[in-house]
UniProtKB/Swiss-Prot annotation:
The gene coding this protein: pqqB
PANTHER family xrefs: COENZYME PQQ SYNTHESIS PROTEIN B, HYDROLASE C777.06C-RELATED-RELATED
Designated name of the protein: Coenzyme PQQ synthesis protein B
Keyword field contains Transmembrane helix: no
Domain of life: Bacteria
Organism: Stutzerimonas stutzeri (Pseudomonas stutzeri)
Lineage: Bacteria, Pseudomonadati, Pseudomonadota, Gammaproteobacteria, Pseudomonadales
Length: 304
């Protein structure tokens, strides 16, 4: 299995366009040893030929240009994107579909709840129906049964419901449902190796731990170091837990969870611009290094 990190930041990217927190100011000025990042998205392939996008970020055009494998140039108009999987309907995970309109029709796998959001509160399916067939919905069932995307038959994909909330625009924002947010367990049928992917993980319940223990590699939510980080940095008033993100530090945090899984490769993704782990010289980054926890970066490649 080939995995390419197209974007590794949370919504807004890093630096965020309107933010002057310590991290954003420092990376712009060149006084912080850190790497700019686009908004979270990955691509998967079973053979390096055809690829599946997992989420389509607002930065998708720049991400595609940075990864030549997605433009094989076999004909006048071409792409190696053979399918799209949406893990939720958050703005920073689906707005890139608008940029991909010239390549319609696209096969888009998502849950019924995500499809409802994207035909009502943010009706991308309706809007793009005017472009050469638009988005063709392929339903993701939450029955723990694996499914396959035809262009990548070597990958077995299982969707796992995560405890989370629908986006602010959603008609059922205050009434969460299974399928608002999912994680993926992806297994390569030939190598037998597997990835657990959950960029929006608010709570690690016991049933999730069983999937995480099975995986060879974890690519999980690294949004915030502290639950009150937005408040501490004076850029927002919400806690990470209120936004559906488990922070890294403290009792029950992501570090504690990952420490209990010593035999797997552990990588954080969806890093918020305020998170001190973006600073390569920070004590928080040193702590991750000491614990064998990696931080995803744009352009990172993983092979399983």
């Amino acid at each position: 299995m080939h995995i390419r990190i197209l974007g590794s930041a949370a919504g807004g990217g890093f630096p965020q366009w309107n933010c002057n927190c310590r991290n954003c100011r420092g990376v712009r000025a060149g006084t912080l040893r850190a790497q700019p990042r686009t908004q979270s998205s990955i691509a998967l392939s079973d053979d390096g030929g055809e690829w599946v996008l997992c989420n389509a970020s607002p930065d998708i055009r720049a991400q595609l240009e940075a990864f030549p494998a997605l433009q094989p140039a076999r004909q006048l108009r071409d792409t190696a994107i053979a399918g799209i999987v949406l893990l939720d309907s958050q703005i920073d995970h689906c707005t890139g579909l608008l940029t991909l309109r010239e390549g319609c029709p696209h096969q888009v796998w998502c849950t019924e709840m995500v499809h409802q959001d994207l035909t009502s509160g943010f009706p991308l399916f309706n809007m793009l129906s005017h472009w050469n067939g638009g988005l063709q919905h392929q339903l993701i069932e939450l029955d723990a049964k694996p499914f396959t995307i035809p262009a990548c038959p070597g990958l077995s994909i299982t969707a796992i419901a995560l405890r989370s909330s629908a986006p602010p625009y959603s008609p059922h924002r205050g009434n969460p449902h299974p399928g608002d947010n999912i994680g993926l367990f992806i297994e390569d049928r030939r190598s037998g190796r597997s990835l657990f992917y959950a960029p929006g993980l608010g709570q690690v319940e016991e049933h999730l731990l069983s999937w995480m223990r099975r995986a060879d590699c974890l690519l999980v939510d690294g949004t915030l170091w502290r639950d009150d980080e937005m408040q501490l940095c004076e850029v927002g008033d919400k806690l990470g837990s209120e936004m559906g993100h488990l922070c890294q530090s403290g009792p029950g945090g992501m570090i504690e969870v990952l420490d209990g899984l010593p035999s797997v490769r552990k990588i954080l993704i969806h890093i918020n611009n305020t998170n001190p782990i973006l600073d390569l010289d920070s004590p928080e980054r040193a702590e991750l290094d000491a614990r064998g926890i990696e931080v995803a970066f744009d352009g990172m490649s993983i092979h399983l």
